[in-house]
Design a protein with these regions (language model features):
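N-terminal basic/disordered segments at the start of proteins
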Residues: 1-14
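Alpha/beta enzyme core
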Residues: 14, 19-62, 66-70, 75-85, ...
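Cofactor-binding loop segments of dinucleotide-utilizing enzymes, especially the Rossmann-like FAD-
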Residues: 211
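A short, acidic, flexible beta-alpha connecting loop/helix-capping segment that sits on the rim
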Residues: 238-244
Length: 264
């Protein structure tokens, strides 16, 4: 096992073999309502929920490093790239993709893993080709500095209308694994059986994303379906930090992932 494998292992529970990561990297790609609170205050609440990891951008990791600087803290996971997800911004600027930081810089910031997008179906084929090249290059560099790379493999390109198509999700997840991902973050198909199809075709662990905020019962049910379908964990964001009680919501989702009720 190399350093990347060792650090990847720290994200996964020893007993359940699964991981629950809270995503808090939305400020670069989506319009976050100011009324949800100050970023560092929200990050503190997220850490208090005791997820296995927290996904943040470079700036917030710098500003909130003290929240991860203790034994037993969640693993800081670094968003290393940028794309346009907000539909109104897409209308103004089109589809765009850029790399934000390098694995070496991520290691210097204290990240325990990196996350990068891999988006199938953009209007311009060159964007997908450049995206594949950037992810493959980062995967190589990340292992040189002992960091694992989680690839967020999705169908968010404008040429694809069905964003949860099981066959296409299986295809993009397989591509992610083949070009060097240590794990994949992707959509839950909405059905455990079709999710199992996606998981079976991917050579690395699959974790599912949460998407737009929904009702608590629906979110928990979706999480259960993903785990039943073979997902090795969840990377949920808005459904945690936009919840009325982020700590309680984290506890509910951790129970789904790890199968152990969280006391308190």
């Amino acid at each position: 096992m190399d350093g990347a494998g060792l650090r990847m292992g720290r994200l996964f529970d020893r007993d359940s073999g699964r991981s629950f990561i809270t995503a808090f990297d939305h400020g670069t790609t989506l319009r976050v309502p100011p009324e949800v609170g100050k970023p560092l205050d929200l990050l503190e609440k997220i850490v208090a929920g005791e997820p296995d990891g927290v996904l943040v951008g470079p700036g917030l990791l710098k500003q909130g490093a003290h929240l991860f600087a203790f034994r037993g803290a969640p693993v800081p996971v670094l968003r290393a790239d940028w794309t346009i997800i907000d539909e109104s911004m897409k209308g103004e600027l089109g589809e765009r993709y850029r790399v934000l930081t390098t694995p070496k810089e991520g290691a210097a910031l204290g990240a325990g893993a990196l996350v990068m997008y891999l988006i199938m179906g953009p209007e311009e084929g060159t964007m997908f080709a450049d995206n594949v090249r950037a992810v493959a290059h980062a995967a190589h560099e990340a292992h040189q500095v002992g960091l694992p790379l989680i690839v967020e493999a999705t169908l968010w390109g404008s040429r694809i209308t069905e964003k949860k198509d099981p066959d296409l999700l299986a295809h993009i997840c397989r591509i992610a694994g083949e070009i060097g991902a240590d794990a994949v973050k992707t959509e839950y198909t909405g059905d455990p059986q079709t999710m199992a199809h996606v998981v079976a075709g991917c050579p690395v662990p699959v974790l599912t994303l949460g998407g737009a905020r929904g009702g608590e019962d629906a979110v928990v049910e979706s999480a259960r379906g993903a785990i039943e379908g073979g997902a090795k964990g969840l990377i949920f964001g808005r459904n945690v930090w936009q919840a009325d009680d982020p700590v309680r919501m984290t506890a509910s989702l951790r129970e789904v992932v790890h199968g152990v009720p969280v006391s308190g």
